[in-house]
Amino acid sequence: MSGQNILKCKKCQLEITNKIITNHNSDTFHEQCFVCKLCSTPISDPYFTDKETGDFYCAKCEVIRNDQSKPLRESLGFCSLCYKYFRQNEDILTIDLERYHIGCLKCTICKKGINNEKYYREKMTSKLSNYCCEDCFEKVDKCNGCNSMTLGQTLLAMGKNYHANCFKCFKCSEIIKPNSPYSINKQTNTPSCQKCN
């Protein structure tokens, strides 16, 4: 057998001398080794692979398996971004009382993963908040009202950028809506609404 490639079974690591079964990852198996973990029947398409254990499941048993783990998955909760359930013992990123899979939450600018320590969040312009890593935060435009980044629609007033909800009267704190009249206090360089003029 020298000089020849010996095919080994991915599961039992023994040489394959008869029928070869190849899965989607090009791994090779004995026919009797490539079976469903639950019912032990030979695997055929479609089949499912458990990412944690590497075990294979036929389509019928995958349905059973999901039904069995549903209460556990619901008790663990789901990611606020992709809405997929968390797995048991999975690392979870918690930010502002919302929970995410590690890797789901990314910087809006550079697309690198956001960690739990150094991030900035823009809450004003969209239902789904924009997040920014510390490095990119130094480069983006900031709202003059809240000093948060302005990645969505902004209001240009007094030569500065504002979130629409951040441009407020200095005296009464009412939001000054776009195209509404306002005056500027020359001493403090702050806006006042028409009511407080």
From Swiss-Prot:
Keyword presence, Zinc: yes
Residue ranges of every copy of the LIM zinc-binding domain listed in the record: 7-68, 77-139, 141-197
Highest taxon listed in the record's lineage: Eukaryota
BP GO terms, sorted: cortical actin cytoskeleton organization; filopodium assembly; phagocytosis; positive regulation of phagocytosis; response to imidacloprid
Molecular function via GO: zinc ion binding
Protein's UniProt keywords contain Hydrolase: no
Assigned GO CC terms: phagocytic cup
InterPro entries (UniProt xref): Znf_LIM
SUPFAM superfamilies, sorted: Glucocorticoid receptor-like (DNA-binding domain) (SSF57716)
Keywords from the UniProt entry: LIM domain, Metal-binding, Phagocytosis, Repeat, Zinc
Coiled-coil positions: none
UniProt function note: Involved in the regulation of phagocytosis. May repress ChLim and activate rab21.
Record PANTHER family: LIM ZINC FINGER DOMAIN CONTAINING PROTEIN, ZYXIN/TRIP6
Subunit structure of this chain's protein: Interacts with ChLim and rab21.
Protein name per Swiss-Prot or TrEMBL: LIM domain-containing protein F
